[in-house]
Amino acid sequence: MEYRQLLQQYWGYNDFRGIQKDIIHSIGEGRDTLGLMPTGGGKSITFQVPALAKEGVCIVVTPLIALMKDQVDHLLQRGIKAAAIYSGMTRQEIIKTLENAVFGGLKLLYVSPERLFSELFLSKFRHMHVSFITVDEAHCISQWGYDFRPSYLHIAELRKIKPEVPILALTATATTDVVDDIQERLNFRAKNVFRMSFQRENLCYVVRIASDKETELIHILQAVQGSAIVYVRSRKRTKEIAQLLKDNDIKATFYHAGLEHFTKDIRQQDWQRDNTRVMVATNAFGMGIDKPDVRVVIHMDSPDSLEAYFQEAGRAGRDGKKAYAVLLYNSADARKLHKRIGDNFPEKDEIRKVYDSLAYYYQIGVGSGGGHTFSFNIAEFCSAYHLSLTLTDASLRIIERLGYILYENDPNNSARLMFLLSRNQLYLLDNLSQREDLVIDALMRLYGGLFNDYVYIDEQLIAQRTGLTPQQLYLILKNLNARHILHFIPQRKMPYINFLRSRVDGEQLVIGKAVYEDRKKEFEKRIQAVIAYAENDKICRSRQLLRYFGETDSEDCGRCDVCLDRGQKSASEQKMETCRQAILDFLSDHQRHHLTDLDTLQLPERHLDEALEYLVHEELIQLEGSYLWVE
């Protein structure tokens, strides 16, 4: 079936947007392809449509579990066979999903990068008929990117197993260097890049110089109505700012990675359903969240890079209507940004000291410790050896990048359990309390595979089903564990250190140029770019951002604080206004007109399409099928 027919049949759209069609044809022809599309540009269509058109299963690599689940649900609702593999599934569920892919029962299989290299996945992958591999958030593979993830580096190894399978890499943020690095790391057979302009014509970028950021924040949220996200750097600040907003009669809540899964889900749902207007969050919030009507994104603190800022700011106005991205800035921010360089890259002697102290802490001698995992309390560790918490955390991350340890500082793994008795033995038990009976019954109804393997459980859900409090449920599970009826592994919240190699003496710790000096230099460049953006009040904000991402021929936007201060509008904005006004004048008779009637206006097709989209979004005209009118 032709691509456009698939788009109409499954999504109900008449045509592709922007560079979607170019990317689809490229991967459809078997060419390695990199697509650069801003947030809201329709990335998912570029791999979902060709996945349906081509024989076999498309493997989609993404780090975003929430996005995986959301996209799989939407695909299944459309009658498209899709599945995902993520933490929380039993081994039997994973095997069933993989075998479904092997035997042709799936068109799309979503997998996190960490799970790609389990023996189980690789053994099944070898037998799959793979149409192509999609790498979402592809900037994560680049060490020059702002969100490098080491697990992404191994994706190219899949090509050794299936060298004929093409790769589609997608990202919403990438500089010229990162674009080249992505293609090199994924072993592209030939360079092949499709770029969609990162320009957002409905988004107004604003920098507010504010000595009192809290007062300015309240002023903005009172002036701009609608859904909002406020980004801050610390977990503590999320709670403080949310309370400040509530004290000023603005409905708000807060979100950060340290909250319980259940709490995060509830708060996210309340915000998405507009029960809560403002989400105050760290950068843990936003990726994979589909809420098109966010009217303003406000950064109380400057991010570490323009890539991060552009992606977070881009969560505003995805419905095409006017929206704002505001950065609150003052002279103290520049000092804080410069301080982050030293905080992220401690002196090499400090890194070696942390490594040796870690070995002393766990009593690991030189030449031993490889493969061992230890619970880790960074506050206790720093106190014991009189170390700075900030510099220690950064040192551990560098040591991890060097390949000596695995440092998991923010785990939130769900609880797991497995029955130690058979189903028949459970039924014969006569010494269970009523509550224990309720819990066992709920477990058997909610989860399969409990008699064969450890299964991740949702304690909040089980508590709801049984009418117990989470504390009561926890005590019952601990009691059943003590009586050897089941084995219960509570939710792990304690960070841990895994020694990937046997210990070496700190003086022999090899801190390579690529991991330290080169990355530090790149970090400094990104910090300086943020400062330059915030302090440059002479060049259009949109032009500054577009230039950073390699678009050097853009015009002034006419909407940002710089342009409005100058009282200027770009030539393109003036053309668009002329085009919109011509359409409104044509429809001023309040009659229904066919779209083809607009041909008499002789407007450029690109301007006509954009003008119509704007007028429909702003509800200035009505569009039904191929007819339009003004009420």
Where are these regions (language model features)?
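C-terminal accessory region of SF2 helicases/translocases
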Residues: T276, D293-V294, I298, S302-Q311, ...
